[in-house]
Each structure stands twice: as C-alpha cells, then as structure tokens.
C-alpha cells in the first residue's frame, strides 16, 4: 500500500506528459519530460534498499547522486550538441560529414587519452573537485564554440574558418568532459554497496540518457525556437546549441559545490564496506599511478572489458551520430493537402523525428534491463547481461543492413532504437558499474578512466572512418549500406568477450 501511495505522483506525471504529447506542442512535451524522468527514478530509488540503509542516509545519498547525475547529463548536453549543430552546418556548407567526423573523432581520442591523467587525478582529489572542473571547463569551452559559430555566421565565413577553431576548442571541451565519468564512479563507489549497483546502474543510466535527450531534442528545440527567416528561408542561430549548454553547466557547477560529498563520513554518516575490490578502506590510493595502471592492465577481466567497451564506443556513436546524418540525407515524397512535397525522413519518421527521446527511452530500457537481470538473476555479475545485449546488437545490425539497402525506413528507425538500448545497457554495466566493482573505492576512477577511455578511442576510430566512408553517400542507400556493414564485426568481437567474462566477479581485498 505504501509503494502504491509513493507511485501516485509518478503515474499522474506520466499521464500528464502523455496528454501533453497527444494534444499540445512538442516543445512543451520536451520541457516537461525531464521532470517526469526525475520523478520516475526517484520512485525507483525509493524501492531499492537491499542492504538496509537508514532513511536519513538514503535521503542524503539521493541528493548526492541526483545532483551528480544531472551534472553529468548537462555534460552530455554540451558534448553531443556538436552532432545537432553539424547537421545544420552541413545544410549551409559550413561543415561536411568528413569534417564533422574528424572534429568529433579527434575530440573523442582526446577524451579517451585524457583518462591516463584524469583517472588517477580523480582518485587523488576526489570526485567532487573533478566534477566541478568538468562542468566549469566544459561550460567555458562551449561558450567559446558558441562565440566562434556566431562570428563565422555573422561575418560570412567559410568552412575552413570554422573547422580549425572548432577542432581546437571542441578537443578542449572533450578534455574537460573526460573528468565527468571518473567523477561519477569515484563518488558513487563510496556511497553504494555492490548489491545496489546493478539497479542503481539502471537509474544512473537513465540520467545519462536524459543528457542525450537534452543534447538532441532540447538543443534541437532551442534552435527551432530561436530561428528567424531571411528571404522566406529559415535562418538557424546555431550558436545557441553551444551557449545554452554552457549556461546549464555553470548552474550545475554551483550546485556541485554545495551539495556533493565524496564519502558518507563527510555528510555525517559512517563509511561502510561496499563489498567490492577496495584495497584501502579510506578510499585513498596508497600506490603510485604507475603501480595502479600496472595492476589494472595485468587483470584479465579488465583487459576483456576494455576490448568490449572499445567495441561499445564504435557501436554506440556509430548509431547515435550517423543515425542523425542518415535521416537528414534520405528523402521521401509526402502528399499534404493534395500537394507533393519532398522531405527528409528526419522530418517524417517517428523514430528520427524524436531522436533524443528515442535514445533516452533506449537508455532507460537498456540500463534497467541490464541492471535488473545482473542483480536479480546472476548474483551481481555483469557479464551475462552484457552478453545478451551484444547478441541483440549482432542480430539487429544484420537486419539493418538489409533495411538500409531496401529503404525500409521504419525498420531502420526501430532498429536504431533497439540497438541503442542494447549498447547503452552494456556501457552502463561495464564502464559505470563493473569499474566500481573491480576498482573499489580507492581505484574506481582510474579503472573507469581506462575502460571509458577505450570507449572513446572506439568512438574516435568509427567517427573518422565512417566520416570518410559516408562523405559522398548523399541519399544513395547502396552507399549508406556500408554504415551497418562496417559495424557488424564489432558486435561479433564484443559478443565473444562478453561470453569470456560471464562468470567474472570481484574479490574483496579491503585493508585498513
């Protein structure tokens, strides 16, 4: 009865949001949705207490991870905004697909390599300080990108005048962004027992998915709301795709200062044994960074997770990024009031029209599926859920190769949703949850940095490679067919290594 009472506000919000979607504007729907998501995960968090924490502890923990999670969501808003902006840049000749692939690819490599320094730094300084570095640095970088965009567009600049400044400052943005993931893992490793992390991984994956939604749909809404018309043609103020995230990031940087605590003891509660591979109970590494890296890179399970997550990086952004460009490139003819009109499937297909929403739902679904079966059916082992999700991706990309070739747009849209669900679920389980399990409180950030670093090395590899492969694809489905075909081998590699870590579980090594 108590759980039913708790669920009533959530149910009412979902009903309200459904009513808004069916009867009012898409922009109002976008504005309300983040509050619905927060309500849902608050309710789910209230149901999950397998180790019997006190009510006071759980309330303080809630505010700690909620602000931390929303800070990370805002980082996503300032990371994938380039994808939204690049589609508009491409339409006006300021950024080709190859240029976008190069900028994002190099930025992703910077993100991945930065973990070599930023992982141990987060373990040493604590996640609170490094999430503040992330939000402030990314805010300033996005503000500069917005100014560059404004200057080039207002002064009639060309693609070359945009490319090099963007390459430099987007890479700087990605350096600061790389503090985000390690900060999350470092803080939450001290606040959550290993038995809580599977379901919590789903909750936190939801917050990450909210960030993807903000990046694609909220940034897209902002561009639509700020556009003007010149000679009857829409003129998009693309700089707001960078200024808006900068403002949001500064707000969360301020909240981080006052709300986040690295450990329960800093908030007036006792620290506790989290049941993971923590070596030193105070959570501070006693080894040099080189010694930690040597230990990590000689651990067979971590090495296999690195291989899996490299593939996840190829696949995740292989869908999220190129799905947008595919949708803008493919054209269909619609008949509206008896008049034929050629439109892109980005404006005609449900899945591509609501790309951010679809990716968010995919992330929520994949995260909770992976976390639930991991904790409830496999004793908090992360390998089995990752295996099932990789198998889903293998089947999905094989079918997608046919769907792209034969222009089955609805099937391509659905499969993009399904495979995003799978890959985000894997990413949450391994980079977000297993890194805490195998790193422990003292080395969690370094392990997360290594694993997530390879995610973005995979991202960089596919971004540059697919950018070159698809540069001249235009609206030719036979050329776009190389998109899913390129990604299929990485599902096979990931499937093999997820099977290899099926029984992996951390050994507790706590020392006082």
Describe each PLM feature range:
Residues 79-87, 299-371, 427, 459-466:
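Extracytoplasmic gate region of multi-pass secondary transporters
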Residues 39-48, 246-274, 497-501:
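C-terminal membrane-cytosol helix-exit motif in multi-pass small-molecule transporters
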Residues 124-135, 375-390:
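Cytoplasmic membrane-interface "Motif A"-like loop-to-helix N-cap segments
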Residues 21-31, 204-264:
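Helix-loop-helix hairpin linking two adjacent transmembrane segments in secondary transporters
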Residues 136-159, 391-405:
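C-terminal ends and interior cores of transmembrane alpha-helices
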Residues 198-224, 362-363, 452-463:
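Glycine-rich segments within core transmembrane alpha-helices of 12-TM secondary carriers
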Residues 169-206:
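Cytoplasmic helix-loop-helix junction between adjacent transmembrane helices
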Residues 380-430:
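C-terminal transmembrane helical hairpin of 12-TM major facilitator-type secondary transporters
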């Amino acid at each position: 009865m108590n759980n039913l009472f708790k669920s009533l506000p959530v149910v009412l919000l979902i009903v309200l949001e459904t009513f808004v979607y069916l009867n009012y504007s898409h922009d109002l729907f976008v504005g309300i949705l983040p509050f619905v998501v927060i309500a849902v995960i608050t309710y789910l968090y209230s149901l999950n207490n397998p180790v019997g924490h006190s009510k006071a502890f759980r309330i303080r923990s809630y505010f700690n991870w909620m602000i931390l999670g929303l800070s990370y969501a805002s980082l996503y808003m300032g990371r994938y905004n380039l994808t939204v902006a690049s589609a508009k840049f491409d339409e006006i000749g300021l950024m080709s697909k190859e240029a976008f692939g190069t900028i994002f690819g190099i930025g992703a490599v910077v993100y991945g390599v930065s973990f070599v320094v930023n992982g141990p730094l987060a373990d040493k300084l604590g996640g609170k300080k490094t999430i503040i570095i992330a939000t402030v640095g990314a805010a300033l970088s996005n503000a500069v990108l917005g100014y560059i965009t404004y200057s080039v567009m207002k002064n009639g600049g060309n693609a070359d005048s945009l490319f090099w400044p963007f390459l430099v400052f987007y890479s700087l943005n990605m350096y600061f962004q790389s503090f985000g993931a390690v900060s999350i893992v470092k803080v939450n490793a001290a606040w959550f027992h290993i038995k809580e992390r599977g379901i919590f991984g789903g909750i936190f994956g939801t917050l990450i998915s909210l960030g993807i939604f903000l990046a694609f749909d909220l940034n897209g809404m902002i561009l639509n709301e700020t556009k003007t018309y010149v000679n009857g043609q829409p003129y998009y103020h693309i700089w707001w795709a960078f200024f808006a995230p900068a403002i949001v990031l500064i707000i969360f940087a301020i909240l981080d200062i006052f709300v986040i605590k690295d450990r329960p003891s800093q908030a007036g509660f006792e620290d506790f044994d989290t049941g993971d591979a923590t070596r030193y109970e105070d959570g501070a590494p006693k080894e040099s960074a080189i010694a930690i890296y040597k230990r990590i890179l000689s651990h067979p399970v971590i090495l296999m997770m690195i291989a899996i997550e490299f593939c996840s990086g190829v696949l995740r952004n292989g869908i999220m990024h190129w799905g947008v460009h595919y949708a803008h490139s493919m054209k269909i003819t619609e008949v509206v009031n008896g008049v034929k009109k050629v439109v892109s499937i980005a404006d005609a297909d449900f899945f591509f029209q609501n790309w951010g929403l679809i990716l968010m739902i995919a992330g929520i679904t994949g995260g909770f599926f992976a976390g639930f079966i991991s904790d409830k059916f496999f004793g908090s082992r992360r390998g089995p859920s990752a295996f099932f999700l990789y198998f889903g991706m293998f089947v999905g990309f094989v079918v997608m190769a046919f769907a792209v070739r034969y222009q089955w747009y609805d099937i391509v849209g659905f499969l993009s949703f399904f495979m995003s669900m799978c890959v985000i679920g894997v990413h949450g389980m391994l980079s977000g949850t297993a890194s805490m399990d195998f790193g422990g409180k003292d080395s969690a950030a370094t392990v997360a940095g290594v694993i997530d670093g390879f995610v973005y090395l995979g991202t960089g590899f596919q971004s540059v490679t697919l950018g070159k492969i698809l540069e001249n694809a235009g609206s030719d489905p036979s050329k776009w067919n190389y998109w899913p075909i390129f990604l299929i081998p990485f599902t096979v590699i990931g499937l093999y290594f997820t099977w290899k870590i099926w029984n992996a579980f951390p050994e507790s090594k706590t020392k006082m």
